[in-house]
Amino acid sequence: MLWQRLAVVEWAALAWELLGASVLLIAVRWLVRRLENLSRDPNRCGTLSSLPGASAAVSAQPGEVMTMDAMLARLKLLNPDDLRQEVMKAGLKCGPITSTTRFIFEKKLAQALLEQGGLLTSSLPKHSEVTGTAFIHGTSRTPAFVDRKQTQQACLSEDRDFGYSVGLNPPEEEAVTSSVHPIPFSASTRNDNHKAGVTTAKEPLLYYGVCPVYEDGLVRHERIHVYEDKKEALQAVKLIKGSRFKAFPTREDAEKFARGICDYLPSPSKNMSLLSPVKAMPLCSNDGPKADGLCLAESETVNKERANSYKNPRTQDLTAKLRKAVERGEEHTFSDLIWSNPRYLIGSGDNPTIVQEGCRYNVMHVAAKENQASVCQLTLETLENPEFMRLMYPDDNMDMLQKRILYIVDLYLNTPDKVGFDTPLHFACKFGNVDVVNVLSSHPLIVKNPRNKYGKTPEDVICERSKNKSVELRERIREYLMGHYYVPLLRAEDTSPVIGELWSSDQKAEASSADHCRSSPRDPVMTLRAFVGPLSPSKAEDFRKLWKTPPRKKAGLFHSIRKSDPERGIERVGRELAHELGYPWVEYWEFLGCFVDLSSQEGLQRLEEYLIQKELNQKAQHEIGEEEGCLQDRTSDFGSGKKYSNSISVGAFLDGGDDISLEEVKNQQNTVPSQSQPSVDKFQNSKSGSPSLGQKADPGEAAVGFYPDNSRNGFCYPLNSRTADGRETEATNGEEALPPPVSILTQEFDKLNLQSLGDNLFETPNKNRELEDKILASSKGVVESGLASPAAIARLENKQVRTNSEVSEAMAEMSLGPNSPQLGVQAGLEPGFSSATADPTKRLFLSGEEPSKLDRDVLAALECAIIDPGLYPAVHRWKSTVMGYSPSDRQSWPSPALKGKFTTELVDLDCCHSCSGRSSPAGSSPSKPGHTTFSSGLHSPGRYSPAHGRHFQRVACMARLAAL
């Protein structure tokens, strides 16, 4: 038992020793911490009586230079009104002060004050004021601690606002209000366990307006949905599909919102008394900017856009329909989809629609990856069509539509994917798709040197995924990436050619050819006639020098060609050089109305279509000529004698069964003018002047037949002037047969109608199909009345480019032709002489019925072309016909008569359609989208070639202005 008592005593002593050591250790640690605190903050032990001296040692005096951090800390203590005043006093521009913009204005103001030597105005709070306030409220925090806390708040505010200025999610409105109006520092520092005592104000009454869908909001829902309870507003939003709600301080504003009047109204915060003056200013101001120079962007009403009826396509449709059509190159299916719903291409915020999630590919990524150059071209053409963008935004003006077009096209061309940051140009170069590279690199908005995730440009990844591509293809891709340059040939009205400077669609500075721009009204108007390209810059410059100064071996030949053929000699030289070097070449042909290389497959197809159309016109002319004889007989029979002529005129002027005397009939007949021999001037002025009076019929010589059974008025006229034995009746007493007055009036109206049709030739020269139908129908009517000769009608049916003088000659021929009802007999020509004997197998030429220099020029352009009779039968027949003439005869062929000035391509080449069938940006209709075909041949003029240069230079200029 003794040993047990000893053990208890020992354990008790040991416990007391441990307890004493612990207390001593705690005391030592407390003293050490106390000493550390005193050494860190020697001013902590100061009293309230020593406040002025202590604060004077820390606070900055007026005129004292401060650091950037201290300046920012002091500016953080200002309320928005004081901060705005300081910014304005510093000579800086100030806008709305929010949680996002406050740090920007504070930083600008601090920099401005530091540059001015740190001179602070009296409105800025001193450190002494802050310190005094803190000690009055019994806080233990020092000005240095306040500076640290304010600096930390500034850093937190900067971190919180990061990204909002570059388009990321904005902060909540409650956060905006709380940061703009911070709680006073004195109210947040209490010595009751260092807890902030903040008194919240009572929330004002809010009204929640619920706005239904814009189109049918006032139809389906007659009542105006305004609620005072937020739960009721949320319940109404659930019941009304597609609606939205917003809180307002007044009932009137909520009712406006519920009616669909979406003017900008700031959402009320929980404490309306602390709203910033920028937010509380009037919404509209007729006086312009305020006196303090604030920007009133937020006070302006938001542009009301009418919502379109297109819904976002389902993910299944984007994958199974749109993406599959792009991958397979189904242009018609792709075009039908995007025109039926433009949201297949344009997503929310005018961003490209994503067709493959994960990698976030759009249509251009997929098309570039699958080598679908035609889909890439069709996508760009559709997006650049204002009518397509108008489907999404029907109320936008043209300027806004163009800005939207530039924005969406730039995104489609230069948006990287999510995985490797590869643009469509990266994909095209990576897989060696040279046609896609050609389409993309030729656009003026393309960025040719973007870097992907691994820091590589498109040039660095050429054929990275296709190792079996040839070296020539790799070089072509590199040349396309260098730029698309063209060597243009320009001509003035006097046909003097000029080889212009290099042209490119993405030129950044001066115009393409500054040497031929008109600096004076006396300078000739230069128009584009041919060009070579696209080429790399070095090749384009070398070809330009070679074209201007041919090689010594061929200098004599080329010089003789240029001198002997001033109209198209330099084109022949450039064509031969381009074909020899394998460069793309196109020239303008007036009879086709487009730029094309006739030796290419595309040029042969265009020529084949033109010749087939011309053969059809000649065949129709021949059929009209065969029927002209009987039609002329009918007209001449009406005017074969004065007896029947008078009968016709009398019957024409008798309307009903009213009683009329014979003398009145004779007087009316004498007042009808007969057609005299017209002239070209009288015919051209027939719209304003009346026809001249001709010979009057002698009523005394007219023997009017009376047939009471065949005529209501007692007068009749025979329907056929032939006798029983088939012979034609002759003129009475050997006098000339005069046409009936009714026929004369009909002919005058036919002439006026035909002249109006001829005038339309100059208004719409490119609408050949519609105009042909009108002219052909009118021409048949004129031939039936015996007014025009078939040769004159054929000239109007022809699809060639017409001049004013040519149409005037055609009109004169129609009125003075040998088949005219009056002049045909005077000239002694028999009816149907001109075209009744026309040969249906008449030889075919490009201009008119006789060979001309145009046939020789086209033959020279086809010198190196291989013409397949099975594919191009009309071209083969035409070439055989032309080759049937000897070279000396072909040299003597005259040039086509062009007595007037051209009214087509010489005015503006931007309106000409490309020979590849691509329409202009505004060439399609939303109801009938044009299905274009892309030609990847070297001899096809690109969409971004000099033929469309003015349009795409304007596009590039607008893009550069928008980037500024």
UniProtKB/Swiss-Prot annotation:
Bias (Low complexity) ranges: 919-930
GO MF annotation, one: protein kinase inhibitor activity
Residues annotated as transmembrane: 8-28
Keywords associated with the record: ANK repeat, Cell cycle, Cell division, Endoplasmic reticulum, Membrane, Mitosis, Phosphoprotein, Signal-anchor, Transmembrane, Transmembrane helix
InterPro entries, per database record: ANKLE2_3rd, Ankyrin_rpt, Ankyrin_rpt-contain_sf, LEM/LEM-like_dom_sf, LEM_ANKL2, LEM_dom
Residues exposed to the Cytoplasmic side: 29-964
Residue windows of the ANK repeats: 420-449
GO biological process, one term: negative regulation of phosphorylation
Occurrences of domain LEM (ranges): 72-116
Residue ranges, Extracellular side: 1-7
Record field: compositional bias (Polar residues): 667-693
UniProt xrefs under CDD domains: LEM_ANKL2
Domain of life: Eukaryota
Region (Disordered): 667-705, 919-947
Function in brief: Involved in mitotic nuclear envelope reassembly by promoting dephosphorylation of BAF/BANF1 during mitotic exit. Coordinates the control of BAF/BANF1 dephosphorylation by inhibiting VRK1 kinase and promoting dephosphorylation of BAF/BANF1 by protein phosphatase 2A (PP2A), thereby facilitating nuclear envelope assembly. May regulate nuclear localization of VRK1 in non-dividing cells. It is unclear whether it acts as a real PP2A regulatory subunit or whether it is involved in recruitment of the PP2A complex. Involved in brain development.
Recorded family membership: Belongs to the ANKLE2 family.
Oligomer and partners: Interacts with BAF/BANF1. Interacts with protein phosphatase 2A (PP2A) components PPP2C (PPP2CA or PPP2CB) and PPP2R1A.
Identification of the protein by name: Ankyrin repeat and LEM domain-containing protein 2
